[in-house]
């Protein structure tokens, strides 16, 4: 570890050195810190330690040192000092916390991922809910006053809704949770007791083959009383034993049966016994039971294996020919057809198309009614229609032909219907399968909404209750007219297509016909309508006025249109103008009557007989619609409306035509017993044109609003997407932080073991490199080796080496750069006036292997504290001053500098230990336990074979991979040993000054505050690093005690000049003149030793030393 942040302080004094200049240098290497680095740094992605990473790291670094010709000496840590053991214990406590924190972090990771999954699930649920709500809102709501009796159609619909196609890959639910699976109490796995009991059950069973079956009477009552399993086992074992030779060899059998005939008789007896046992087994298993058994099958033929009852026995294969004459002829009668249809229907009902769960929705009442109507239509027109599946697949042309044909047939039926009398009418009514529509009060605005209901089908919008099984009309007497109308369930020309159950929300707002300009024009009073193009036949009775104090309550229409009406739905480009216009007045119930114009259909029938059909109304394809007229009724009467069916076909309109033009000759002949009025109406082109102009303006306004709504929708989606991206980014960032924290906690939890140290030492022995184990600290031993000149430098990344007295340290030797960082203690003294004792003081503040340091104190603040409190007792003075601040007894003078003000703000955060500063820390650094032996080191030759085997055993490297790295290094070593290397010029300058060959680079401080702290520390004269005696004597002689670099450099230059000259009096005078020039211009009478500063120790006895050396 070293001193925290010390490398940052010493970085300005580093020198770059090339690796090529370190040839034949003896370098002491701290091996313990290498192992520590490999343990902490070399890990996998999950933060786990890689196996044998320390061996691989040592091998690579050793090869690099040997390649550059460096002679390393490895030093391992020994026993730790007491102070370090205390620090290690504290760190172990922290390491235990790290292990616990690693578990906590893993739980946090799991919780974060689970929370993320829950957020995604919740977001998906919100989107599904929003989608469902949007689809529900886009659907038109039915009035609350309308009720529906769905007692008949509910079971069928529920059957379709509840049925889901089974997923072949969906596994059944388990009775046991996943937590119990694979555990010791997993019910699928036998426990230890059960396994022991199961094994013991087999060990207790005696081998049945050991018994003698020759004396067993298989027909005895005792044998027959045995269980079937035992009898079968005994018979099987006896039969198998009969095939053996009793375990005797051929020689033994020859001795037992010297006569070959006796041996043959013995074999025949064994054969008879085996056959008897085989027959008993066949009888026991039922194989001998008589009866035919089929062995093969072919059309019109039957193969039967029959047992032969004759004396010859055996089995015979018989063939029975199934010719057509012998086969029965199946007659398809009505009962058979009916039963087959029922079976087919049952088989068809077994499977249904089920919508996707994510897009499905509950069926609203409108869809329930549509389903019921579809069922009624199938029952009513079963002979003229095909099945649903065939109907879904027919083409448009076929639909057109069917619709035209049925409309012609219904035209004929309608003519016959009008020719019937009232009694015949009632009789026909009782025989037809019809249904009842119970209508309630419905606003007129909602009635127009029924015209545009679906993309493909215009369904029945507002209907009443559907009756039960009888599906008959309920008769109701009207108080005013007392008439009943025959209304059919559906127009026979209309054919309902298969609708899509998956109703997606529209990307635009649905058209509200109640608010359109078209419908506003339709809501004019009755008088306006009567004054315009409306003709009421004179045959209509007075009590049957169509428009008299009434409102339009219900328009029931079922229309099947093609996809060419899609444009008319959102854009109102093809409005449907009903011939029935609403009358705004008091709300009253109205009767439904149906217009059935006859003359156009007669013409259509005649044209159809000729082969051509001409639409008198300019209609398109098979689009048909039933229009029901309303007659007034008493408002108080809320009973059911009895409707009798009159088949009619609505004149349909072209989608290309903007309006509906109804000819005036479309009139309904009034019947005396009907009491209904026929209505033929037409709209003037000018009125329609005016309506269309206003409609286009309304459409433009709506499209502009739709554009604005779309922009708002897109912006909301983008904002939501950005929010989701931000949430995802935050999640990824948090996940990355937790993973890094988990890796660091795993790294801090591991520690160096003795096995790692032994493997590294074995590798060094195989390389022939010397290594030693220090008594205590490896850094201290390296410093001692450098002091004894057994090595030329120290290679370590531990800054404690300077505190132990290391003066030449190499750092970052194995990085990618070609330069190594060299730190010299002389540079520290010259540049920053820092010595070993100052570094130890920094260790008290920053923390090291021997002390924990002070919290909230960094390298810059530590330098400022040492500058503010200098001297040997500086740290003690700092402690007293800080205690005054903590207790609140500090005066204003105690906080009179920027540094003290800064420290005053950290009073509650900095905690001083009671033993601070601990003098034992100084003693441990100044006087460590080291080996003082001066025995020189020897370097050997690597053992290639042993290295291969060692790397194979520890790392798993093959011989080829080891040779790829090791052979070039060994070859280069031999080449340098025998050929030699060229000497460089720098080795001749390593006498007194060893720094000339490693020039320093100008350093730019990253922190201005650090630069100021080092500068202030540099200008201060340290009491622990006194000037040399000669410099001090010169300062005493001239009445000034400057410890600055300028004074020292000038005096040293002068002394070199003096030493190069011969001793003479003139030289003495010149020296005196030179020294006088250094003296400040002050009064000579004022210069005395007493006037010098106290902090400088003056020694006048050294004034004559230069002259004495000169005389010698």
UniProtKB/Swiss-Prot annotation:
Keywords: DNA damage, DNA repair, Endonuclease, Hydrolase, Magnesium, Metal-binding, Nuclease, Nucleus. Pfam families: XPG_I, XPG_N. The keyword RNA-binding does not apply. Transmembrane segments: none annotated. Residues 1079-1089 have a biased composition (Polar residues). Its cofactor is Mg(2+). Residues 1056-1112 are annotated as: Disordered. Its EC number is 3.1.-.-. CDD domains: H3TH_XPG (cd09904), PIN_XPG_RAD2 (cd09868). Coiled coil: none annotated. PROSITE patterns: UIM (PS50330), XPG_1 (PS00841), XPG_2 (PS00842). It is found in: Nucleus. Single-stranded DNA endonuclease involved in excision repair of DNA damaged with UV light, bulky adducts, or cross-linking agents. Essential for the incision step of excision-repair. This is DNA repair protein rad13. It comes from Schizosaccharomyces pombe (strain 972 / ATCC 24843) (Fission yeast). The lineage of its organism: Eukaryota, Fungi, Dikarya, Ascomycota, Taphrinomycotina. The gene is rad13.
């Amino acid at each position: 570890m070293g001193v925290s942040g010390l490398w940052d302080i010493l970085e300005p004094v580093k020198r770059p050195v090339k690796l090529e200049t370190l040839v034949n240098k003896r370098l002491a290497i701290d091996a313990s810190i290498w192992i520590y680095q490999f343990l902490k740094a070399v890990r996998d992605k999950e933060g786990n330690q890689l196996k044998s990473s320390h061996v691989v790291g040592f091998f690579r670094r050793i090869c690099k040192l040997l390649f550059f010709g460096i002679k390393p000496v490895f030093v391992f840590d020994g026993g730790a000092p007491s102070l370090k053991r205390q620090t290690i214990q504290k760190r172990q406590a922290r390491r235990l916390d790290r292990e616990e924190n690693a578990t906590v972090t893993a739980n946090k990771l799991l919780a974060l991922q689970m929370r993320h999954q829950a957020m995604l699930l919740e977001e998906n649920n919100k989107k599904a809910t929003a989608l469902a709500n949007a689809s529900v809102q886009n659907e038109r709501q039915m009035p609350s006053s309308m009720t529906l009796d769905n007692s008949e159609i509910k079971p069928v619909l529920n059957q379709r809704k509840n049925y889901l196609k089974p997923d072949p890959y969906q596994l059944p639910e388990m009775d046991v949770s996943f937590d119990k699976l694979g555990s010791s109490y997993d019910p699928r796995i036998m426990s230890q007791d059960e396994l022991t009991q199961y094994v013991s059950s087999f060990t207790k069973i005696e081998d049945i083959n050991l018994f003698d079956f020759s004396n067993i009477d298989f027909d005895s009552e005792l044998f027959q009383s045995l269980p079937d399993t035992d009898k079968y086992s005994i018979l099987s074992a006896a039969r198998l034993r009969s095939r053996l030779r009793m375990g005797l060899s051929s020689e033994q059998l020859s001795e037992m049966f010297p006569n070959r005939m006796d041996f043959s008789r013995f074999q025949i007896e064994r054969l008879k016994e085996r056959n008897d046992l085989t027959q008993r087994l066949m009888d026991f298993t039922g194989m001998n039971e008589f009866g035919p058994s089929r062995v093969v099958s072919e059309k019109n033929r039957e193969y039967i294996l029959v047992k032969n009852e004759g004396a010859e026995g055996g089995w015979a294969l018989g063939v029975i020919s199934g010719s057509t004459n012998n086969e029965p002829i199946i007659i398809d009668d009505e009962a058979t057809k009916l039963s087959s249809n029922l079976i087919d229907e049952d088989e068809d009902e077994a499977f249904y198309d089920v919508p996707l769960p994510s897009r499905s929705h509950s069926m609203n009442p409108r869809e329930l009614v549509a389903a019921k109507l579809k069922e009624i239509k199938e029952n009513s027109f079963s002979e003229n229609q095909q099945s649903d599946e065939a109907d879904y697949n027919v083409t448009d042309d076929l639909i057109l032909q069917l619709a035209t044909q049925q409309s012609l047939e219904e035209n004929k039926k309608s003519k016959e219907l009008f020719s019937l009398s009232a009694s015949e009418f009632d009789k026909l009514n009782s025989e037809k399968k019809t249904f009842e529509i119970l209508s309630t009060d419905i606003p007129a605005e909602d009635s127009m909404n029924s015209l545009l209901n679906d993309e493909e089908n215009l369904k029945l919008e507002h209907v009443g209750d559907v009756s039960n099984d009888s599906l008959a009309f309920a008769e109701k007497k009207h108080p005013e007219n007392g008439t009943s109308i025959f209304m059919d369930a559906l127009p026979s020309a209309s054919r309902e297509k298969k609708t899509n159950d998956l109703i997606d929300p529209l990307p635009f707002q649905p058209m509200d016909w109640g608010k359109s300009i078209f419908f506003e024009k339709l809501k004019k009073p009755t008088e306006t309508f009567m004054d315009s193009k409306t003709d009421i036949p004179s045959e209509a009775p007075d009590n049957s006025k169509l428009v008299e104090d009434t409102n339009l309550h219900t328009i029931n229409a079922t229309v099947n249109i093609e996809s060419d009406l899609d444009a008319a739905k959102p854009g109102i480009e093809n409005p449907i103008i009903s011939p029935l216009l609403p009358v705004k007045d008091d709300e009253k119930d109205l009767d439904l009557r149906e217009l059935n114009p006859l003359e156009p259909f007669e013409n259509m029938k005649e044209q159809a007989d000729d082969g051509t059909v001409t639409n008198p109304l300019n209609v398109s394809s098979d689009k048909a619609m039933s229009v029901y007229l309303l007659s007034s009724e008493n408002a108080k009467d809320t009973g059911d409306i009895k409707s009798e069916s009159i088949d009619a076909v609505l004149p349909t309109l072209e989608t290309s035509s903007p309006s509906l033009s109804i000819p005036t000759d479309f009139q309904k002949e009034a019947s005396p017993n009907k009491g209904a009025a026929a209505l033929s109406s037409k709209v003037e082109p000018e009125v329609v044109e005016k309506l269309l102009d206003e409609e286009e303006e309304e459409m433009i306004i709506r499209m502009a609003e739709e554009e604005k709504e779309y922009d708002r929708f897109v912006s909301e989606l983008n904002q939501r997407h950005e929010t989701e991206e931000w949430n995802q980014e935050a999640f990824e960032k948090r996940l990355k932080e937790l993973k890094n924290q988990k890796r660091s906690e795993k790294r801090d939890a591991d520690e160096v073991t003795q096995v790692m140290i032994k493997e590294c030492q074995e590798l060094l022995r195989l390389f022939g490199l010397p290594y030693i184990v220090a008594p205590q600290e490896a850094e201290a031993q390296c410093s001692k080796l450098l002091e004894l000149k057994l090595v030329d430098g120290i290679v370590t990344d531990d800054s404690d080496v300077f505190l132990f007295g290391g003066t030449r340290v190499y750092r970052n030797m194995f990085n990618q750069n070609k330069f190594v960082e060299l730190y010299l203690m002389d540079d520290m003294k010259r540049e920053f006036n820092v010595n070993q004792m100052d570094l130890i003081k920094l260790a008290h503040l920053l923390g090291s292997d021997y002390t924990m340091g002070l919290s909230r104190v960094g390298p810059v603040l530590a330098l400022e504290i040492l500058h503010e409190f200098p001297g040997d007792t500086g740290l003690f003075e700092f402690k007293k001053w800080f205690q005054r601040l903590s207790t609140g007894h500090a005066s204003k003078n105690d906080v009179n500098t920027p540094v003290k003000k800064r420290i005053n703000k950290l009073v509650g955060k900095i905690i001083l230990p009671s033993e601070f500063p601990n003098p034992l820390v100084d003693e441990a650094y100044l006087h460590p336990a080291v080996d003082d032996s001066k025995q020189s080191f020897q370097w050997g030759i690597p053992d290639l074979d042993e290295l291969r085997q060692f790397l194979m055993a520890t790392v798993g490297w093959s011989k080829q991979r080891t040779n790829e790295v090791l052979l070039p290094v060994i070859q280069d070593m031999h080449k340098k040993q025998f050929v030699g290397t060229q000497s460089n010029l720098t080795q001749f300058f390593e006498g007194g000054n060893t720094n000339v060959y490693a020039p320093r680079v100008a350093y730019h401080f990253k922190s201005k505050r650090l630069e100021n702290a080092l500068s202030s520390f540099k200008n201060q004269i340290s009491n622990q690093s006194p000037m040399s005696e000669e410099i001090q004597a010169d300062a005493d002689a001239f009445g000034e005690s400057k410890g600055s670099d300028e004074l020292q450099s000038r005096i040293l230059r002068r002394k070199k000049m003096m030493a190069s000259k011969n001793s003479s009096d003139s030289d003495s005078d010149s020296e005196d003149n030179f020294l006088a020039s250094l003296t400040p211009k002050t009064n000579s009478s004022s210069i005395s030793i007493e006037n010098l500063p106290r902090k400088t120790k003056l020694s006048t006895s050294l004034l004559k030393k230069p002259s004495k050396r000169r005389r010698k």
